[in-house]
Amino acid sequence: LKCNKLVPLFYKTCPAGKNLCYKMFMVSNKMVPVKRGCIDVCPKSSLLVKYVCCNTDRCN
C-alpha cells in the first residue's frame, strides 16, 4: 500500500501491518490536512480532530 505524505506529491510505501492510509484535519479548518500517512487502525475522530481513512494506493 502506498500512502501520500503531507504534501500529496510525495508518498511512502507502508510497512507490514499498517494497511490503511489516513489524513487528519482540525475540525475548525477542514481544508488543510495536518497529517497524512500509514496507520494500522483508524483513530476515532473527536471534537477537535477528524480522521479519514482508506485502503487503496494514495487514496489519502
Swiss-Prot record:
Pfam (any one): Toxin_cobra-type
Q: Which UniProt keywords apply?
A: Cardiotoxin, Cytolysis, Disulfide bond, Hemolysis, Ion channel impairing toxin, Membrane, Secreted, Target cell membrane, Target membrane, Toxin
GO MF annotations for this entry?
ion channel regulator activity; toxin activity
Q: Which domain of life is it from?
A: Eukaryota
Tissue specificity here reads: Expressed by the venom gland.
Q: List the disulfide bonds.
A: C3-C21, C14-C38, C42-C53, C54-C59
The record's Gene Ontology biological-process terms are: killing of cells of another organism
**InterPro entries found in the cross-reference section:** Cytotoxin_Cobra (IPR003572), Snake_3FTx (IPR003571), Snake_toxin-like_sf (IPR045860), Snake_toxin_con_site (IPR018354), Toxin_cobra-type (IPR054131)
Q: What is its main location?
A: secreted
State where the protein is found. Secreted; Target cell membrane
- SUPFAM superfamilies under this entry? Snake toxin-like
Query: A cellular component term (GO) from this record?
Result: other organism cell membrane
Question: What's this protein's function?
Answer: Basic protein that binds to cell membrane and depolarizes cardiomyocytes. It also possesses lytic activity on many other cells, including red blood cells. Interaction with sulfatides in the cell membrane induces pore formation and cell internalization and is responsible for cytotoxicity in cardiomyocytes. It targets the mitochondrial membrane and induces mitochondrial swelling and fragmentation. Inhibits protein kinases C. It binds to the integrin alpha-V/beta-3 with a moderate affinity. Is cardiotoxic and cytocidal to Yoshida sarcoma cells.
Q: Which family does it belong to?
A: Belongs to the three-finger toxin family. Short-chain subfamily. Type IA cytotoxin sub-subfamily.
Indicate the quaternary assembly.
Answer: Monomer in solution; Homodimer and oligomer in the presence of negatively charged lipids forming a pore with a size ranging between 20 and 30 Angstroms.
Q: What is this protein called?
A: Cytotoxin 5
Q: Which organism is this protein's natural source?
A: Naja atra
